[in-house]
Curated annotation (Swiss-Prot):
Primary residence: nucleus
Region ranges (Disordered): 215-254, 612-643
Function: BrlA, abaA and wetA are pivotal regulators of conidiophore development and conidium maturation. They act individually and together to regulate their own expression and that of numerous other sporulation-specific gene. Controls temporal and spatial specificity in Aspergillus development. Directs the differentiation of phialides and is continuously required for maintenance of their function. Expression of abaA leads to activation of brlA and wetA, cessation of vegetative growth, and accentuated cellular vacuolization.
Keyword Nucleotide-binding among record annotations: no
One cellular-component annotation, GO: nucleus
Protein name: Conidiophore development regulator abaA
Listed Polar residues bias regions: 243-252, 629-643
The keyword Disulfide bond belongs to this UniProt entry's keyword annotation: no
Amino acid sequence: MATDWQPECMVSQNQAALESIGAHSDRALQNTSGNVQAYSDSLAHHDTTGRDDPLQHYTLKYPHPPVPVPSHPLPTATANLYHPQLLSHRYQVKKLRRLQSNGSSYAGSRRGRSYLKSQKYLEYRARPRRDTGKDGEPVWSDELEDAFQQALEANPPMGRRKWSERGKSYGRNELIAEYIYKLTGKRRTRKQVSSHLQVLDSFLKGDPDWERLVREQSDRSTAQTQPVGPRWRTSMDHLPSSHYGTHATSSYPEPMRLMPPYSADLQLPQYSPTSTQQDTNNNTIQGLSFDMWVSAPNKPDRIDDAYHLYTRLQGDQRQPPMPLEDLKNWRVSFPHLSSSLSDVNDPLNCEIILLETNLELMDDFPPMGSRLGIHLELDIANPMSGTAPTVNQMENWTCSTYIYEDGRRTMEAYHNLTKPHTTKVKPPFESSWWAKTFTKLTQDKREAESTGHHHAADERTRRYFHSLTAVQEIRATVPPSLRRLQNHYPGSPAEESKRMAIILWKFRQTRPNEVGTTTWRKLITSPDRALTNSPRPSTAIDLPPLSLDSILLSKPTSNLYQAPPQHHDLLHQNAPSQQSWSLYQPSHDHVNSLYHSAGAFDFLNSITKPEEGLSDKTAPTSVLDPFPNLTQQTTSQTAGINVSSGTPVMLQIPDLSLSSNLGTYGLGHESHYVPSHHNAANLHDHSSTTGLGHYFAPSTQSLDEISHSHAPWSAPNTTISGDTSGGNYHHLPFTTSDHSVTVSRESHQNHSFEGLLPSDDLVGIVGGLSGDPNMNGAGPEHTSSAYAEHTAVEAV
């Protein structure tokens, strides 16, 4: 039998790369990579009887199902495969099988469906199937019809509602189409399902069992129950996948075991460790084949005629899926996978396969002219989504191979693959590198044995394979024609290569009397939060409606002027301990007092004034200080705080540049309130400020450092004229254009009440203040001398 060897992968005996190995380089392995016919393909054409080779016990990877034995004699004329009697017999067998699956197989797991035995339905199914699908088979064959009926039971009617799964919405027809595909491996679109439902409904309408499956019950649609969803045991990806090669050979898979009938306590599918959580547009690995052997000279390049067998994946040696985090030191052993998982620009959305290979090494060099053969084949299932391209439609297939030793990359190779005509892809596995490695290991073993260190050489080889790992990444691109159908714009990620699969390799040397075997399993990554269903309670909780009055009463009343935490800490360093002034909680009827008679907002008169003086109270300005945390730092100069011998202390607020676009009022220059369109703090500005808490965070600057970026603080002053006068408030005079007060800092535009309130309201606001000398320089004769110390403001 001719084999499909790649000539460019042949390694000659006198190759320069092998001359440096040693004296036995003339006996180095010649190698070939991949793309040889599987053992099962040649087993059927060659006689295997009488062989003592253990390879004769190979099991076929593509087993044919047993042919049912008919109860009546078959026609003997087999020359014509389309004999009418033979076709009639096949139809009767399929019909009998379908009726059996519809009847006794599900008698105890679902309700009866009387319409399947109705005359109209049987006549419809007896018609010859003329319409065919893209796969060349009838659109609704007996196999697909049975899967369709099962899908109706598994997916109750949902009306116009959608089922949310992995961040996407699915209608009932889409769920039915997906159910059919997972059960049979044959794809039928949502429109085909809808058309088939309409055809069946035309002559089954009125049947109670049919109505139950196609229409929502009135009591269920009006009642406030939980949303109806698929009655599957787990999510859509958790259906049992078909065995390797089942789709190609098995004419009728085992029917699915369904859930009990609908109940209101049905739970939503949730994530489990055995799930894959893959998108419907992604591909899954449904089968794998791997062999590595040495062919003797002048012998066919077949594994059944192998001179030595390093390892083989016999049958479908598939292990249960395992979480990736359970793989010990996977980030160190597979650096490429670790970097791929952390790449946010190219998220990992393909399956990860782990192959654990046990290698049985040779005791001596093979005969001169021997060849190394490696066969690796992946069976990649088509995506579940009807719009995603199939495997044979993908283009530009590539394979990247990375080989590591203790996490250090020792070899890297890239190969272009042949476009597959089916779902099977055959990537190479660097047979040249393996031939060189096996030859070098055999040479080291022979040299160690000649010096009497046999066990040392064996342990060294075992440690080498224990530290050896490999990663293979298979990619492909969507063809331009299908890319346009999917409405992808130029430059979109669809034009880039798509990961089809990632293969991880771990190696081990066999023990004495062991044979080389290979197993594989799928690795499960942690599900993305956007692709995972949120759990919901098993029973719904109906809360009584809340009236508007109850909502308003339950809302806590916010105090307009609320003292910030640690407001009196500013005075502890420069004044004796004083009792804080507890603010009066304004009642609801006090809201009107916040507004002046002219209708303007009154910021200063909103505080309820006590009748007695403030000789033993904290100054109001210190209570309303919006920058209390600036005083946490100690400084050698107490500039900016004017202290009198027996009166509260007044804090002068420095100029702070406020950001713009805050939809409220803030403190600006000269402690004036400014509107939202000018010098207000923005909650989301460029300074990584996410809230007011960040804006008023504890400062790490001292007061001296702040003076370099803001107006300088005045020199300390402890005497104020008239601070021992009467105990009543004095009114501040309103300065007009012809009467000004000397101020030490330069004035800034738009930092006053102009534009915020009319001039008449300004007179009322400022005139509302009393002339109490205890206001620390706020009376008519109290012009603070602190402002006279400096006449310039440092530029910011």
